[in-house]
Amino acid sequence: MPPTAPSAAAGSCTAAVNPHGTGCVSGAWGALGSPGFYWNPRYVLLGVTFAGAPATGPSSIYSGPQVLVVKTDGTTFPDGDAWKCITCGVPAANEPGVDTSAFTYPPPHAFPGDRRLLVGNGVLDCGPYQVTDPRCTPEDTRIYPIDLDGQPLGATIGGGQTREWRLNPDGVHLGWNALVQTGGSYDEFAFMGRLRFDVSLQRYDLTSVTMLFNGSPRYQPYVAGPGGQLRFNPAGMIGEFRGWTSDGRAALGIQSYESDSIDAWATSLATGRSRPLTGHAEYTDPMFASPNGRWMLNEEVIGSGRLDFISGMEGIPPVTDQLPTTGYVSGIRNNSQRRFFLPYLVSTADGDSEQVNAGGDPNWNAAADPVWLADSTAVVWAENLVTAPACGDANPLPCPVSGEPGGRHSRVMLARFPTLPPSPAISPAPVPDAVPWGTPYTLGQAFPVRPHLPAGTYTLAGDACGTATVVISTDSSGALITGIGVSYDGFSDNGTDIINGTESVRRDSDSVFSPLTWQENLRLSGRHTGTKVTSPDGFTLSPLILENIFQATGTMTTTIDGQAYTQPWNGD
């Protein structure tokens, strides 16, 4: 990495700090952004924030958010650095309409051939040269904006804030999310479109746009059959779009797999059927598939202790989650800026997983998103050190002192797997534009209202044994679920985690942004024993949790094999 700037002041990155004059990175939290995929395993891309550049002169270009290509094999570029900045010094006339502040996130990603890169909300093009080639210079580099109906990606377009875009491995399609926040709704929908270069306008347009959503009951998490029999239905389980499988033929997303645990799913573009990739991550969203398709690298909250009080009991079906509670549970995963992510290697064959950095410093937390090297032998991810207000002052956790070069609060990690031999990446053919189960989308088209189960009493049979009786209540219009209660009688989907007892969740008002109150009195038996209980008046979460501000009334405690897990302090 470039050295750390002594300060943000102009000129602080002197020749004494970096004799090559190729810049210094900021020491601030998050200054080393997400790594990005490159098709040659000797390199990885990385978004960074430079600081301390002089106001004038050749080194002045190393300023603000930029994208690097970084050597991973211990060698250097001709100037002696292990990195090359590929966006620094690009003339403004060569990048019109591009949001350079997005160079650190979403992650950069190389198109097949490594001559074009997704950087920020644009496509960097170095003509006939790969970006690692010395002949690829700033003057010869163009960054073309990506537009949706004439508006730049990243803007609020058609009522939805476009975010979290990811390049399909086919190099032809892009996926993204639209976050919809109005007075009466808070939702997110996934999209896919084809990148088409408009020569006359010198930009990429997103065409053949499809919303990766279907309002039919066949694509909802639970389906009601005759006699009120409920059936879990893994289809359309994208939730928030998070990327692609290695062959580009399935969208990665997050949805509840067990109650109060938000897991990774792969949903087929051809059929809409979904399969879980993680079994009980508690929460995950940063993820990347190995180029050979055999592994995932998921950043998960399990193992950090953050969500164990609400997510720690396995074997509970995601019934109360259908209120929905997902946004509230996911909000607990952060303490202000602090994320509690840990990197896990996950098998795509059976979901078995292992923490990559077990025994690491818990004050360093993984940051979105990770990436694999192209030969599927190693992974790269960024980490941030906990900083105020998540530590210090009234917080019981003292703020640690960074031991990284220059005292910086971000770092980039590379983990190699000696037992994984180099293997070729899947070479995906372009996927079809049409998604048969999706919804063709035209800008301005109203966002759908997600369907839900109607009020009533239902029965859910365990896949292995037992039953659950489910009671759903709605508001007077039937438009909003206001409460879900469940009674479990020897319920088990896997035959090893057996659930008995009752639980419920309710809105405290007929509003999407209402406080939510949980009542839990559950018992676990089988391979583990435990309880999940709330205080007599329940556990109530403020909607401030949607802004990652933990404010709760009452308590929830989960005990597994004698170990009790309690909630964070308010404000933590």
Mark where each language-model region is:
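Sequence signature of WD/YWTD-type beta-propeller architectures
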Residues: 1-572
